[in-house]
């Protein structure tokens, strides 16, 4: 346990008295303000020792989302579809749908004709629901009621039963709202929208301009270390299969720049440090996977050339707000930020000590919430701490006023 040393610099105040005697009207000089207390030995800032991925001049996906998806799928090919993605269906349910589909397409001699028969049956028999319905494929098959997600799920299952590759896409129906549709392989990629009875070649961007894909329910690329998908309009590092203590996020895969690191499975337990290169634009928007899937990480560092985010200490910031705080960090020294608003740091289970920088004016109520192991906060004397700024922290929590010297 490192000792804390408090260095108090005291001033000797000398009072000058007039030489002409006790009847002088001169007042003693006003002492200078006390200089701040300094705290040493915290060791909150740990310099990175690993490396960032180097720019390899890979291709940037800088077109429309639909064109970016087309480039990725053309590169990946149909073999990426090895199953039905995240569709929820039991073996018995799948068998029943397959038996029905086998009879439906009996006599159809080409994959295109099989597809057309299945597509026709869905668009003719499934009705768009006005209220809540279960959009898993089997309930849709049984009730003949669905919204767009149910249409797309059932189409994928029925095509899969006939060995035709299909994946579900989620995104936006332009000027309408959220939508789901399919990408289907029939000697080339097709866009299939059973909800709206739409079907066209993927390369026909004019016919598909009303569809704006955000995510695909399929793995695009995979190697011995990493798995990649298309998520939130980015080529995303979805899974890290193996790594040492220091994880360098790759710059590219299969000739395309990787711009997102948002895993949906746990990182290897060995990973304690993450090195995020200048290529990464996002760690997630609606869901930040590192918050849930990086339990052993203590430090995250961002390349200084990254224009979307930065790191200070072990914390990643975006727009002056903590974007990612490693789950296993125990001592955290934050950037100089004027105001720590509500939920500045919330639900962190391992942090024990936080250090606030000079220049921070206010810690608002509930700035730190539900951090059960947080026991110490080092805060400059001039920083205002609102009531309940530290809420649901350790029972022995204590604030020490002073400035931590690196």
Residue ranges of model-derived segments:
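N-terminal module-boundary/linker segments of secreted carbohydrate-active enzymes
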Residues: 32-98
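Hydrophobic/aromatic-rich core segments of domains that either
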Residues: 151-215
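Secondary-structure boundary elements
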Residues: 77-143
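Positively charged n-region of N-terminal signal peptides that target proteins for export
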Residues: 1-4
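Bacterial Sec-dependent N-terminal signal peptides
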Residues: 15-42
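Structural signature of tandem-repeat unit edges
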Residues: 225, 230, 242-259, 268-282, ...
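Bacterial N-terminal signal peptides
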Residues: 7-16
């Amino acid at each position: 346990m490192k000792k804390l040393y408090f260095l108090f610099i005291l001033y000797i105040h000398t009072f000058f008295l007039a030489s002409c005697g006790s009847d002088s009207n001169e007042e003693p000089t006003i002492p200078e303000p006390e200089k701040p207390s300094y705290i040493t030995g915290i060791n909150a800032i740990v310099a990175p020792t690993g490396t960032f991925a180097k720019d390899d001049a890979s291709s940037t996906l800088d077109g429309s989302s639909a064109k970016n998806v087309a480039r990725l799928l053309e590169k990946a090919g149909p073999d990426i579809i090895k199953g039905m993605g995240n569709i929820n269906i039991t073996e018995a349910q799948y068998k029943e749908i397959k038996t029905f589909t086998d009879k439906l397409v009996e006599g159809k001699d080409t994959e295109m004709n099989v597809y057309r028969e299945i597509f026709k049956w869905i668009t003719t028999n499934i009705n768009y629901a006005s209220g809540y319905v279960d959009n898993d494929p089997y309930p849709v098959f049984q009730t003949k009621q669905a919204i767009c997600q149910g249409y797309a799920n059932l189409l994928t299952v029925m095509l899969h039963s006939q060995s035709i590759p299909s994946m579900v896409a989620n995104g936006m129906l332009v000027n309408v709202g959220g939508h789901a549709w399919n990408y289907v392989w029939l000697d080339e990629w097709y866009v299939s929208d059973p909800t709206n009875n739409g079907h066209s070649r993927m390369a026909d961007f004019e016919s598909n301009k009303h569809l704006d894909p955000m995510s695909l329910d399929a793995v695009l690329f995979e190697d011995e270390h990493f798995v990649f998908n298309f998520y939130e309009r980015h080529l995303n590092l979805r899974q890290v299969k193996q790594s040492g203590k220091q994880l360098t996020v790759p710059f590219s895969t299969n000739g395309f720049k990787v711009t997102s690191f948002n895993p949906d499975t746990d990182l290897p337990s060995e990973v304690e440090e993450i090195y995020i290169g200048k290529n990464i634009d996002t760690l997630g928007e609606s869901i930040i996977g590192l918050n849930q899937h990086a339990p052993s990480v203590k430090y995250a560092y961002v390349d200084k050339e990254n224009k979307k985010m930065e790191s200070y200490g072990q914390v990643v910031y975006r727009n002056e707000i903590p974007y990612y705080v490693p789950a296993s960090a125990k001592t955290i020294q934050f950037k100089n930020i004027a105001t720590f608003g509500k939920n500045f740091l919330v639900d962190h289970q391992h942090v024990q000590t936080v250090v606030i920088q000079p220049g921070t004016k206010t810690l608002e109520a509930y700035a730190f919430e539900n951090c059960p192991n947080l026991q110490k906060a080092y805060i400059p004397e001039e920083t205002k701490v609102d009531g309940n700024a530290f809420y649901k922290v350790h029972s022995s929590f204590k604030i020490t006023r002073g400035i931590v010297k690196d």
